[in-house]
């Protein structure tokens, strides 16, 4: 955070995680509002945190010494055993429920930290509560949780936070506009310009245009994960149509649809496509998918009410339905070992219903299918047919904005300057070039973690300071009675493995080799009819 002395009126933004040197994990951003009380002349300061994620690859940190790694926030949170911050954060706002945006909260609570009130959608807060219960964190230590919805305007001290819908891979995603009368920032969160959703609504471009018509914003911090890709991210409506077509072309066959356990937007699209094709649905993706489906229900999303013409059952109900009338939504697209589908393919008698001539839809393509293809071939079920992202590209869609998504949103919000988030430097450079091409100003350098940007009506947008980011490395040790002891230490950003570049080079060469192997295998599999042809066939 910015030092109290000599503070200029305005809004301060500091990424603490997500704008990493080499990856996108641990999203966490500080926003500090500095204004003058017109009655007393005193300086008033309010800080909020947007997202508190953890790093998804702790083994790359300090040679794998720690179980968990989170951005160091002891300058705005009262961490047990450390000095209390001068200006503690007043609130936490969550853009969505993914672990790289939320589960730092779990770690800080286990470190003995008091977390200020947490604001999020009903779905996001339900997922947060489920995680707290699973970790057996006592309820008296939980932060206060405040459910907000699209269109809400929340006043925190001298800062106003307005809530806008975002489109990602889960329901209840938000973008936020933060303003204080001196300056304004639009924070996209993870998003794309998809206005379609089978769980309510996608983004609301009309609300973005209202921002633009009312003067725009001074700065837009924008999801840059996939801006290097041309065009728009595939919409849920396009994905729905592709699945519906496949289901109708294979009306008399069982269909297996592996998905990510957490991608509930995609699950809803697939279920609705099945209903449109008159196919019943079995949801059998293991414990993780079951938890997410339950979270949908408790947040008020009712797939049964949305698709009353079909039966939607869980794993236990599968045996009561004719497999040929069903789409089984499961996990295992990356051959995850705990997937019920993958365990069945490997010969385990786990009750997973699988016809020997089923159609398997693997939404990714190339080397990303290599593991699943290997499991399928070893299963000995030669009657299975595989449809991948090669044959049907629109069975997959990223939850992140591509180039045209950025242009559409930026032209609606009309920021005076754009800054990249959720990316590493190379991807940030792509966003900056794209922004400049479309007439938007950019910062002179990559705002990596620890960079503080000040937005002021007097001086515009500029980099205030650049500091080396710090992290907490955390260990959880369980004693013989099952009690968990948590310890932590602050580590500099340089604590990331010095072998990272070497590891990345090895991984890159392995990926290139896997692509070649995948190409050979796919060619051989297609030759013997294991994989459907892309053109001219009926998808069987």
Please provide the spans of the model-predicted regions.
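His/Asp/Glu-rich metal-coordinating catalytic cores
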Residues: 2-36, 41-91, 98-276, 280-286, ...
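Well-formed, non-transmembrane alpha-helical positions, independent of function
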Residues: 107, 408-409
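Short, structured interface segments
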Residues: 218, 388-390
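Hard-cation-handling environments
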Residues: 229-363, 368-386, 395, 405, ...
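Short beta->alpha junction loops
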Residues: 391-400
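A donor-sugar binding/catalytic signature common to diverse glycosyltransferases
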Residues: 416
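Non-Sec secretion/translocation targeting segments of pathogen effectors
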Residues: 506, 511-540
């Amino acid at each position: 955070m910015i030092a109290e002395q000599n503070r200029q009126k305005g809004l301060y933004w500091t990424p603490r995680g997500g704008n990493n040197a080499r990856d996108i994990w641990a999203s966490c951003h500080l926003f500090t509002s500095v204004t003058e009380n017109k009655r007393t002349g005193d300086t008033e300061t309010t800080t909020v945190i947007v997202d508190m994620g953890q790093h998804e690859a702790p083994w790359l940190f300090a040679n794998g010494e720690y179980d968990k790694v989170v951005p160091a926030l002891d300058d705005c949170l009262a961490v047990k055993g450390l000095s209390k911050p001068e200006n503690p954060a007043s609130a936490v706002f969550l853009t969505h429920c993914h672990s790289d945006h939320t589960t730092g909260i779990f770690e800080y609570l286990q470190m003995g930290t008091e977390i200020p009130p947490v604001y999020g959608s009903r779905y996001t807060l339900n997922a947060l509560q489920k995680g707290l219960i699973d970790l057996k964190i006592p309820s008296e230590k939980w932060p206060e949780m405040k459910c907000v919805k699209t269109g809400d305007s929340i006043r925190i001290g001298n800062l106003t936070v307005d809530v806008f819908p975002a489109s990602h891979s889960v329901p209840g995603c938000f973008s936020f506009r933060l303003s204080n009368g001196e300056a304004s920032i639009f924070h996209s969160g993870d998003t794309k310009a998809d206005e379609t959703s089978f769980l309510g609504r996608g983004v609301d471009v009309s609300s973005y245009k209202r921002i633009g018509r009312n003067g725009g914003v001074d700065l837009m911090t924008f999801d840059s994960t996939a801006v290097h890709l041309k065009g728009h991210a595939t919409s849920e409506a396009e994905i729905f149509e592709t699945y519906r077509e496949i289901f109708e072309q294979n009306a008399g066959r069982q269909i297996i649809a592996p998905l990510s356990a957490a991608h509930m937007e995609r699950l809803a699209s697939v279920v609705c496509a099945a209903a449109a094709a008159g196919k019943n649905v079995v949801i059998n993706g293991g414990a993780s998918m079951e938890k997410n489906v339950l979270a949908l229900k408790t947040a008020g999303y009712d797939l049964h009410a949305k698709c009353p013409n079909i039966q939607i059952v869980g794993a236990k109900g599968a045996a009561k339905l004719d497999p040929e009338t069903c789409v089984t939504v499961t996990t295992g697209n990356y051959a995850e070992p705990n997937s019920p589908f993958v365990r069945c393919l490997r010969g385990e008698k786990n009750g997973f219903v699988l016809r020997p001539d089923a159609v398997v839809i693997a939404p990714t393509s190339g080397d990303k299918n290599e593991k699943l293809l290997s499991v399928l071939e070893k299963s000995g079920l030669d009657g299975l047919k595989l449809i991948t992202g090669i044959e049907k590209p629109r069975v997959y869609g990223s939850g992140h904005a591509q180039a045209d998504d950025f242009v559409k949103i930026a032209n609606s919000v009309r920021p005076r300057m754009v800054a990249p988030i959720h990316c590493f430097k190379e991807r940030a450079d792509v966003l900056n070039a794209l922004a400049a091409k479309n007439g938007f100003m950019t910062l002179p350098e990559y705002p990596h973690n620890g960079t503080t940007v000040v937005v002021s009506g007097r001086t515009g947008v500029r980099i205030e300071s650049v500091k080396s980011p710090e992290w907490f490395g955390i260990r959880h040790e369980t004693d013989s009675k099952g009690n968990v002891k948590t310890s932590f230490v602050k580590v500099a950003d340089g604590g990331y493995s010095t072998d990272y570049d070497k590891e990345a080079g090895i991984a890159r060469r392995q990926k290139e080799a896997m692509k070649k192997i995948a190409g050979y295998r796919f060619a051989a599999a297609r030759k013997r009819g294991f994989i459907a042809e892309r053109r001219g066939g009926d998808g069987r």
